[in-house]
Amino acid sequence: MTTIRLKENEPFEVALRRFKRTIEKNGLLPELRAREFYEKPTAERKRKRDAAVKRNYKRLRSQMLPKKLY
């Protein structure tokens, strides 16, 4: 569980921003969203496979040489 301690005379908005930052670093929010609803094992495998294909395609696109513009 993520906790933060309030410092003396710290505004609530600043404490809330610190809390959000720690949640982001821990990766808690995406995990909660993923666990919100049950996902079939086949759907999970398909989603992960599609994400891997997309990552691979993106990596290949960044390695390709640009076309000559002349």
UniProtKB/Swiss-Prot annotation:
GO molecular function: structural constituent of ribosome
Database matches in Pfam families: Ribosomal_S21
GO CC annotations, alphabetized: ribonucleoprotein complex; ribosome
Gene Ontology biological process: translation
Superkingdom classification of source: Bacteria
Keywords in alphabetical order: Ribonucleoprotein, Ribosomal protein
InterPro entries (alphabetical): Ribosomal_bS21 (IPR001911), Ribosomal_bS21_CS (IPR018278), Ribosomal_bS21_sf (IPR038380)
Entry similarity comment: Belongs to the bacterial ribosomal protein bS21 family.
Name of the featured protein: Small ribosomal subunit protein bS21B
Organism: Cupriavidus metallidurans (strain ATCC 43123 / DSM 2839 / NBRC 102507 / CH34) (Ralstonia metallidurans)
